[in-house]
Amino acid sequence: MGLLVLVLVLATGLFYWFLPASVAVPFVVQRARGVVLDDLSGTVWNGRAGRVMTQEGLELGAATWTLGRDVILGRTHLDIHLDGRAGRFDGHMDRTEADRVQWRDVDFRLDAAALASPGLPRELVPVGVVEGKVPQADLQGNWPVTLDADVAWRAAAVKTPEGHVTLGGIAFKASSAGGVLHATLKDDGEGSLAVDARVAASPLGWRMEGALVPRIADTALTHLIARFGPVRPDGSVSLARKAGLAPAVSP
């Protein structure tokens, strides 16, 4: 009986150490939202997914990853690389506490459609390429306690039921220190819409200032920006709004 127990323990240990990705990943994916992994190979520690798709069926490409074995002790150290028709993504993630996640050296270039929020109306289709670098992001309870992000939406456009709206280039910059987030969103002057927004937020509230100002008279453009608020007599839309105990917006 003792020998049998020893054999079972050794077998369990070997199975854990060389756990096939095709066995482990489906259980992980059940907890993930918005992503489907297929054509799995390798182990859970050094694995590959030949096909990565959104739940809507958009194919992103193939992914490889390296996962630290101390995940069994509750500590996650993950390196991930995605490359395919939708673009590429690289990043390193550490999770040493239940409610704290750290991302480092995130670098991506993805089709705008691949980054579309599930809450975006289906009739609106973002076009263009989104490039970004996030050297560091420390999240506590999903809130960015520390953040440094620089993202650019290049050749930005939106397909709408009324037509194709070109937006040029749009830059998003965000930083967070001491739990207070500051972000800006601004266009490059080449598109049909002047975009200028500034945001300040904390776990207690948020504030936004800015406006959307059309550079041309266009029905599709007017319908698009009307989704963000009432259109003023000059055709613009104010983005001024706040909620809770909002911090001040930096100039």
What are these regions (language model features)?
Residues 1-3, 15, 30, 169-251:
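Extended terminal
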Residues 1-26:
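N-terminal type II signal-anchor transmembrane helix
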Residues 21-40:
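Alpha-helical transmembrane signal-anchor/signal-peptide segments
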Residues 24-25, 69-73, 218-227:
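Alpha-helical membrane-targeting segments
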Residues 35-125, 131-133:
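N-terminal beta-strand/beta-hairpin edge segment
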Residues 77, 144-148, 207:
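Outer-membrane beta-barrel architecture
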Residues 84, 155-157, 214-216:
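Transmembrane beta-strands of outer-membrane beta-barrel pores
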Residues 131-198:
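Solvent-exposed beta-strand/coil patches in large extracellular/periplasmic or lumenal scaffold regions
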